[in-house]
Design a protein with these regions (language model features):
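Conserved blade-ending motifs and adjacent loop-strand segments that build the rim/top face
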Residues: 187-197, 234-252
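Repetitive beta-architecture junctions, highlighting loop-to-beta-strand starts
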Residues: 46-48, 105-108, 164-167, 209, ...
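Hydrophobic core segments of beta-strands in well-ordered, beta-rich domains
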Residues: 11-40, 61-67, 76-111, 122-128, ...
Length: 284
């Protein structure tokens, strides 16, 4: 990045409902070289970084879009988006500390957009008694239910019973409706993780409906998988490491479903190309 903080983190990718456009959004944050997480939350960016593409190969220039200035945010972390078919808008959500409580607690806010240029005023999406960050949402069409997964960033167990640095679950029929908690002993047992992202396996990759929740062991190996055949149960199992292969130190990001044609185009353009100083870049 050559804009503002000069580095981006937590990339999130979404396909338009028409299927012909992709949007990528990310956190505007440089922490490498100073490691001052306090300042990053009090005096950080109030903007999202946005890119657009029609093919996953050719991308627009990056643009910085201010979304959290009106709440006097000290940061705008880990943005993600979910398309709302009820309103025809994207619901974009991120975590911010604000001056309202002297930058004391991370709260997840949301704003609506149709084009990733203009956004509505932010409103609260998730507020608990402890800090909450890194929300991700998935829709289960068989239940007609949304599930959202969020990190308890606080130093104590929150009111939903989620231990510090673990992931808690909520569900709702609508994106902006009432969300109710889903208990999970298994996620409570997986502490010191963040950046959850979840996807459903293709039908030919699993005999039954199966979902994979990736969680980022931020102090160690990075992403590892947790599996379930029943989102409503809230329970996940961690497969033996011998059953899968994860990229080295894969971190906070997004898997999406693509076509064979799209895959071939991406591989033709990028292949196995890694940036120079790739190991250093991973540590940033």
């Amino acid at each position: 990045s050559d804009v503002y903080k000069r580095q981006v983190r937590d990339p999130f990718l979404i396909r338009s409902p028409e299927g012909d456009k992709f949007y990528m959004i990310a956190t505007d944050l440089k922490i490498y070289g100073n490691n001052d997480w306090g300042a990053a939350q009090r005096a950080g960016s109030q903007s999202l970084m946005v890119w657009e593409s029609n093919d996953l190969v050719n991308w627009s220039d990056m643009r910085m879009v201010e979304v959290s200035a009106s709440i006097d945010a000290g940061c705008t972390w880990a943005p993600e988006a979910t398309y709302d078919p009820i309103t025809g808008e994207y619901i974009v959500y991120w975590a911010s500390k604000t001056s309202a409580d002297n930058y004391g607690k991370q709260i997840v806010y949301y704003a609506k957009t149709r084009d990733f240029y203009s956004f509505t005023e932010p409103k609260k999406f998730i507020e608990k008694n402890e800090s909450s960050i890194d929300t991700t949402v998935i829709y289960n069409d068989k239940e007609d239910m949304y599930y959202r997964y969020t990190k308890n960033e606080g130093g104590n167990t929150n009111e939903l019973g989620a231990k510090t640095k673990s992931i808690f679950i909520e569900k709702s029929r609508t994106l902006l409706g009432e969300w109710t908690p889903v208990g999970s002993e298994s996620l409570n047992a997986n502490q010191w993780v963040e950046g959850p992202t979840i996807f459903k396996f293709n039908a030919d990759d699993s005999e039954n409906d199966q979902w994979c929740l990736l969680v980022d062991n931020f102090g160690g190996i990075g992403y590892y998988p947790l599996l379930t055949n029943d989102l409503a149960s809230g329970e996940f199992t961690r497969p033996d490491d011998s059953t899968h292969l994860m990229p080295s130190r894969a971190r906070h990001g997004t898997p999406i479903r693509i076509t064979r044609e799209e895959y071939d185009a991406v591989m033709a353009k990028w292949g196995d190309v890694a940036p120079e100083n790739a190991e250093e870049e991973q540590l940033k």
